[in-house]
Amino acid sequence: MKGSIWTIGDVQGCCAPLAELLAHPEIAGDTDSRFWFAGDLVNRGPQSLAVLRRIMAMGERCTAVLGNHDLHLLAAYAGVRKPSKSDTLDEVLQAPDAVDLIDWLRFRPLAHYEAGHLMVHAGVLAKWDVAKTLALAGEVEQALRGPNWRKALQKMYGNEPATWKDDHTGGKRMRVIINALTRIRLCTPSGHMEFATKVAPGAWPAGLVPWFDVPNRATRDVTVVFGHWSTLGLLMRPDVICLDTGCVWGGALSALRLHDRKLVQVKCKRFQDPNGD
């Protein structure tokens, strides 16, 4: 496929900054470009419905992976979870085209690989190489796209198991895959996921490291592109790129052109306090 790839961080229902970003001369002038979204298209911001409609209308120019807030929307629509006070999903749930939007969303991938870049919402476990990540993501994708997708969503909540075993089955297997791809931030050096600690980057207790610094990570030979971690903010290394720059918290919405790492950002209005996921 021709054209540049612009990868965009967590939008979280902030449609005005998204429109401004896509209209930026550097991006709008790149007429053959394609767009990768690193998940969390919806929630916490005021315009989740408009965001979904806009990105859905981009058609084949857009690749969006599922984030934890996107999965939460699916669960709320399915009746598996009730929206919380901080959620801003009612407009989507009550929309006349809700069925179409939900069907589009549940057919999004959990991982995407192209041109040496692996995009996920949150991260990958150290034992997983690209092929295994895509295969395991595919297991969950198949469940979400099938006729029993509502039942599949019932299995995804919980922090355990926190480590991967090839012989995990059923709900345990699905939870580990979803938690790694959409929720992970910190791990022990042996790769045990840790969800209780929520502190500023660099202030985490001894014995915890960011998932991407777990020793011998099997994806270190490619570049993993992710969002999810607004307090970490913009991070660009040869092996990892974090693009969650806290749009909904009053930070910025960021887009990065992958082939030359050209960065474009637009400032965002603060809609909520940065005290959630």
Curated annotation (Swiss-Prot):
EC number: 3.6.1.41
Coiled-coil parts of chain: none
Record's keyword annotation contains Hydrolase: yes
Claim: Hydrolase is one of the keywords in the record: yes
GO molecular function, one term: bis(5'-nucleosyl)-tetraphosphatase (symmetrical) activity
Annotated catalysed reactions: P(1),P(4)-bis(5'-adenosyl) tetraphosphate + H2O = 2 ADP + 2 H(+)
Keywords for the protein's UniProt record, in alphabetical order: Hydrolase
EC class (word): hydrolase
Function: Hydrolyzes diadenosine 5',5'''-P1,P4-tetraphosphate to yield ADP.
Family statement drawn from the similarity comment of this UniProt entry: Belongs to the Ap4A hydrolase family.
Xref: HAMAP family: ApaH
Protein name: Bis(5'-nucleosyl)-tetraphosphatase, symmetrical
